[in-house]
UniProtKB/Swiss-Prot annotation:
Molecular functions per Gene Ontology: nucleic acid binding
Domain of life: Bacteria
NCBIfam families: PRK12497.1-3 (NF009150), YraN family protein (TIGR00252)
InterPro entries listed in its UniProt record: Restrct_endonuc-II-like, tRNA_endonuc-like_dom_sf, UPF0102_YraN-like
Protein name: UPF0102 protein Mpe_A3766
Family indicated by similarity: Belongs to the UPF0102 family.
Amino acid sequence: MVTTKAVGDGGEDRALAYLLRAGLKLVERNYRVAGGPRVRGGEIDLVLRDRDGTLVFVEVRTRATRSHGGAAATVSGVKQQRIVRAARHYLMRFASPPPCRFDVVAIEGEHIAWLRAAFDAS
């Protein structure tokens, strides 16, 4: 039996290969921020650099089928907030943070959809 984690890890591998072929460069993988007493931590699946220098924070969602609205529909507002929180933490390492965006790679079976600027930090 394949675990959910194994499916997710496989999806991240496929998404990374797809984005590298598109010309992005891997900066970091599975960047995690610890939570606090009232705040859950966050994780960014992939951090990449686009050709124009933009830092790209990528959430990867993998589903076997398109049922229940598909993979992209599972990136809820709460999940977006956690990703943004982790990205803000990540950006603190820069004296002058580069431009950034939040992408989603949705994998449904064999189909891969790359949603550039899927959400913003507001």
